[in-house]
């Protein structure tokens, strides 16, 4: 199983996010969210509380509530900060190539902020579409613009977005489980476990043991895109070579 570096730069791993977040300047929403992101990156979502956040920015907790109404708003803001780093070029004439780039960039962003991934997956579901922060909606808007400008209908563009990001969420959760939740499961340990399976009962798993033990998240993602993008083109492209409604 190929292990990949995840999380913030190892060179700053021992820094106290509380110390890093203190600032003598005027308190504002951006400062609060940046500090919250550092805490989540280091200690996970469970390590973030309004009290700890107030200590990190060096202000009384009451001051925080002037800028963020509650912890839920902070979590939304943290997800928004990370998603703001995902760039979608909605003017790219190569819509398939742009979607491939977006998918790869999203994966890398998730590996950089693994503790934020649960927020990226769950916070939008917990917030009605019309009440989500603008930054949380930006990737959706830009992907829709990319596909609609390429000639797809709005409904088809929305369907493509849902298929792509639905897979991305599942893919990155699976990859992070492999490299973070079970770091002790080395290639040798996994192979040993697979070879202990009864070959008469699990012949396919036994046969695929080498592939299962050499999981490569980047290669898995590219394989999915190689299947998805031509399929979309074949299904939605008419004889004239232009996108057509399903």
Where are the model-predicted features located?
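Alpha-helical structural segments
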Residues: 31-38, 42-43, 72-89, 101-105, ...
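Basic, helix-initiating cap at the start of DNA-binding domains
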Residues: 1-56, 69-76
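A short secondary-structure junction motif
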Residues: 81-86, 113, 117, 171, ...
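Amphipathic alpha-helical packing segments from all-alpha helical-bundle domains
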Residues: 126-151, 155-162, 173-174, 192-203
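Short hydrophobic/aromatic patch on the recognition helix
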Residues: 59-68
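Hydrophobic alpha-helical connector segments
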Residues: 87-129, 134-138, 161
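A short structural micro-motif
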Residues: 164-170
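C-terminal peripheral helix-coil segments that are non-catalytic and often amphipathic
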Residues: 1-16, 149, 177-246
């Amino acid at each position: 199983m190929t292990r990949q570096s995840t999380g913030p730069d190892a060179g700053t791993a021992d820094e106290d996010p509380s110390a890093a977040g203190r600032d003598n300047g005027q308190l504002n929403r951006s400062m609060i969210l940046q500090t919250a992101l550092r805490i989540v990156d280091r200690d996970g979502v469970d390590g973030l509380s309004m009290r700890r956040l107030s200590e990190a920015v060096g202000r009384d907790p009451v001051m925080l509530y002037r800028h963020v109404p509650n912890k839920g708003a902070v979590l939304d803001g943290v997800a928004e900060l990370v998603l703001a780093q995902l760039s979608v070029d909605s003017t790219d004439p190569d819509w398939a190539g742009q979607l491939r780039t977006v998918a790869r960039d999203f994966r890398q962003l998730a590996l950089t902020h693994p503790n934020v991934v649960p927020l990226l997956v769950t916070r939008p579901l917990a917030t009605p579409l019309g009440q989500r922060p603008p930054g949380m909606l930006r990737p959706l808007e830009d992907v829709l613009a990319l596909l609609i400008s390429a000639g797809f209908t709005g409904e088809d563009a929305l369907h493509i977005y849902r298929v792509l990001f639905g897979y991305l969420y599942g893919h990155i959760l699976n990859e992070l489980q492999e490299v973070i939740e079970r770091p002790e499961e080395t290639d040798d340990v996994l192979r040993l476990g697979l070879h202990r399976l009864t070959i008469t009962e699990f012949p396919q798993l036994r046969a695929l043991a080498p592939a299962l033990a050499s999981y490569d998240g980047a290669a898995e993602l590219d394989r999915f895109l190689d299947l998805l993008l031509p399929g979309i083109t074949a299904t939605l492209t008419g004889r004239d070579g232009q996108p057509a409604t399903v």
